[in-house]
């Protein structure tokens, strides 16, 4: 019978506590290496700037930042939009998302943006660009902060989460983004909330090259 070298090592280790400890350390390292090779590094052990992969289940998907695909997920939904986009935002500086919104508008999609009033004028804000492109842009100043980060698309898709529509949220912040499809009762609740804030918001219009606000 052929001898098994690994079995010999195990038998030797069983006769020596010191060898047993070394063997356990080696096996532990091997097992950890195999797990990481197959499954990737566990999220708890990832460095702070690393991205965590998203997941999807039952018409629902989730993505995480930094650099975990949140902006890409938003843009993909906007490119698929056919009739309407209702958007609420606090800070809005993402070049990719404003481009996708303008592209949707040019396809004939009705795009309505309700942005926090103070944040609309922050450095890098895309609110004026949205207004200049012809989108229906409003500003909500009825609250300390209008902090909703939501998109409602075509009466069936909800995008929500902590993720601001900004470059910083994509590349630097720890955020989450949830995309839900065909959740009709949830959609109706989000749509009612959107309409409530739209009702007390001011229009944000462009006049003679300068963005001005005016009442509804």
Across the structure, where does each feature detected by a protein language model lie?
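Short, small/polar-rich loop/turn modules that mediate ligand/substrate recognition or access, typified
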Residues: 2-64, 68, 72, 109, ...
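Signature of lipid phosphatidyltransferase scaffolds
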Residues: 158-216
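Short, structured motif recognition centered on aromatic/hydrophobic residues
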Residues: 90, 150, 190, 194
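Solvent-exposed loop/turn segments at secondary-structure junctions
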Residues: 91-95, 117-121, 143-146, 157-158, ...
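Primarily the HKD phosphodiesterase
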Residues: 74-136
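Second-shell loop/turn segments in exported
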Residues: 60-65, 86-89, 112-118, 175-180
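Extracellular/periplasmic catalytic domains that process cell-envelope and extracellular macromolecules
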Residues: 79, 106, 130-131, 143-146, ...
């Amino acid at each position: 019978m052929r001898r098994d070298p690994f079995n010999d090592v195990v038998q030797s280790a069983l006769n020596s506590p010191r060898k047993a400890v070394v063997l356990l350390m080696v096996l532990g390292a091997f097992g950890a290496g195999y797990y990481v090779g197959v499954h990737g590094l566990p999220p708890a052990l990832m460095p702070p700037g690393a991205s965590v992969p998203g997941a999807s289940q039952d018409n629902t998907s989730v993505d995480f930042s930094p650099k975990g695909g949140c902006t890409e997920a938003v843009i993909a939904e906007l490119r698929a939009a056919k009739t309407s986009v209702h958007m609420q935002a606090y800070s809005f500086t993402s070049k990719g998302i404003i481009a996708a919104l303008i592209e949707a508008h040019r396809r004939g999609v009705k795009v309505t943006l309700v942005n926090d009033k103070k944040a609309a004028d922050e450095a890098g804000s895309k609110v004026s660009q949205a207004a200049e492109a012809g989108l229906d842009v409003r500003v909500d100043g009825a609250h300390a902060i209008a902090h909703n980060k939501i998109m409602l698309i075509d009466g069936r898709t909800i995008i929500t989460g902590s993720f601001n529509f900004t470059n910083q949220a994509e590349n630097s912040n720890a955020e989450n983004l949830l995309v839900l499809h065909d959740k009709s009762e949830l959609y109706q609740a989000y749509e009612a909330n959107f309409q409530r804030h739209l009702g007390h918001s001011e229009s944000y219009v462009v006049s003679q090259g300068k963005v001005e606000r005016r009442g509804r």
